[in-house]
Structure formats: C-alpha cells, structure tokens
Amino acid sequence: MVTTTDYFDSIQQHVSVIPSDVVDKVVKIWRHEYQKHVGVGKRVFIVGNGGSCAIAEHISTDLNKRCKVKALTLSNNSLLTALTNDYGQENALVEWMKINHFDKTDFLVAISSSGKSKNILRALEYTHNCLASTFSIFGMSGKNIFPQYNYDHSYIHIDSFNYGVIELTSEIILHGIVESLVIE
C-alpha cells in the first residue's frame, strides 16, 4: 500500500526531472508558429483519453482565455460517439481532425498516460502526414512506442506506472507552457 507521503514524494521526484529544455523548445515553437500563422487560423488541437482528456479540456480553456490561442479538444460527446461508431475508436480523433480541417499550420498536443493509446498514435501519425508540429506527454509503456510517432522529437516520457503521478505531472508541464504564453 502506498502512503500519501510516498505518493507526494513520487510527484515531487517526477516534477523535479521535467526536462525544461524540451518544454522551452515547445514554447519557442508555439510562439514562432503562432506568430507566423497569426490571422490564418493557427490552432492547437489537444487530445487525450479519460483523465488525459480532462487535462486537455482544462489546458484548452486556459490557452483560449489566458493566452488568446485558438485551442480545441474533442469534448463533444455526440460527435465523439458518432465518429467512434462510424470509424472505430482508433480512428475517431483523426476523423475529428479532418472535420476541423487540421493542416500544417496547426499544432497537436497529445497526452497518453498509458503510452499505448491507438487513437492518439494515429493522431500523431496523421499530424506528421500533414507536416504539422507536435508535442506529446506519455507515461508507462509509451517509452518504447511514442518516440517513433513523434517525428520532431518534442515529447516527454513520465517514467511512472501510476496514473495519478503521470496525470499531475502532465498537467504541471502544460500549465508551465500556458504560463510562458500568457498575454497580459
């Protein structure tokens, strides 16, 4: 059994090893890309499943409200279930990206605590085919899967098998990005 002290120590340990150079690289890419494409529909698509989807929605809200960045998540339940029914769960995100005319001027943020979500991997592959930029955060077994789908190598692997630790660390990373992009 894990004590709360052990749990908090684990979170602190994982936060202390966040590679700030990767986070800074993502902020730099977002700033550059957003300035380059301002006025032409530059958007940030954020995808995840379960708790990662909740994080995606939270960060999307902050990017829209605090940073004036057009951020989207697939949080429309009727659309999600329709796409899942028609195209399968593994293809639903790609179909959503197509409906929203995702292109090379857009940016994808992918969050997968398990590190093996097929729909997230397909979204990354689709993003690569569109020549767009990506940033991924993943945990657990993703260490051996996700890097091959992150063609521009902007990713962070959270080396834990605890969903709570992965999700909290993911959210801290993304809040760090938001804080770096806030427009006063």
Where are these regions (language model features)?
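Generic N-terminal amphipathic, Lys/Arg-enriched alpha-helix
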Residues: M1-V22
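Generic alpha-helical structural signal
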Residues: T5, D9-Q12, K28-R31, L121
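Glycine-rich phosphate-binding loops that contact phosphosugars or nucleotide phosphates
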Residues: V40, F45-E184
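Polar helix-capping/helix-linker motif
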Residues: V17-S20, D24, N76, S180
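Residue-level detector of alpha-helical secondary structure
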Residues: S10, I29, E33-K36, H58, ...
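N-proximal short alpha-helices
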Residues: T3, Y7, I29, L63-R66, ...
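A short, well-structured juxtamembrane/interface segment
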Residues: P19-V40
